Amino acid sequence: MNRKVLIPSLLLTLFLALISQSGKASADECLNDMKTRVKGKENCLAIHTFLTVSEVKPSTLVIFIHGDQSDGGPVSGMIKLAEDVDVPAGVIKIALLRPGYFDKSGNTSSGTSWRRKDSYTPTNLDEVTSAVQSLQSHYQISKTVLVGHSGGAAYAGVMIGRSPGVANAALLLSCPCDIRRWRAFKKDAPWSSLSPSSFAETVPTTMKVITITGEYDDNTREYLAQDYIETLAKRGVSAEFRRAVGAGHNDIVRGDVIDEALRILLRLD
């Protein structure tokens, strides 16, 4: 046997084993304090929690889910939005980092982002859905609103149809609501990501959904959200498309763009 081949092979096996054990440990040893970390199905997801000091018992969760952040940098925009946007007393705002992402402070969600491409997988959707359900149970929440931007909007759109009851309402910003058509437009194929359009028929008719796409969004074009909303509306879901005048794909993540829509979705019966 050639020892020169055997030794590198053994080293590679040990290296891969260490990586596997490290990833498992990060999930098993999750702090899970429901303020900075929450356990998903198998992974430990970083979160930022914003709760206004009030005598009112918390009754509503607003979960902010960021986009793909394709520049490879830290997640920041949706965390700032979650911190800044005004909500009534009794509303807990939580910005959640998708599997494999990190923020400016180095807080990281375990799992994989699939190089920030094609990452709306069943496994990742299960992680985020499980995390939301854990937060609901911990805070004994009766109402939940999902706010997603771009890839985060795809997450939210899939979740409300794939896991009916996970939320009462969803605000989808710059939504690539039909992944097949979005990928075709971007000339990206093949893909494995789940699409909100594939789950439109199972979104509960009790849901409230608002999509907002920027007038100058050259990434997730308006028709992707418009057609999705039309499908929901035909089924009797309270669904509305809005155009953000003068806004592009990323600068739609601003309080002045979403304030009114979020107020509407928070007025849940």
Task: Identify the residue ranges that each predicted region occupies.
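C-terminal catalytic histidine-bearing segment of alpha/beta-hydrolase fold enzymes
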Residues: 226-269
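Cap/lid segment of the alpha/beta-hydrolase catalytic domain
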Residues: 97-120
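A conserved short beta-strand
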Residues: 165-178
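Short, surface-exposed "cap/lid" segments of acyl-processing enzymes
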Residues: 44, 53-91, 95
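The feature captures the conserved acid-bearing segment of alpha/beta-hydrolase catalytic domains
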Residues: 175-240
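Gly/Ala-rich beta-loop-alpha elbow adjacent to hydrolase catalytic centers
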Residues: 147-152, 156
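Alpha/beta-hydrolase active-site loop
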Residues: 112-138
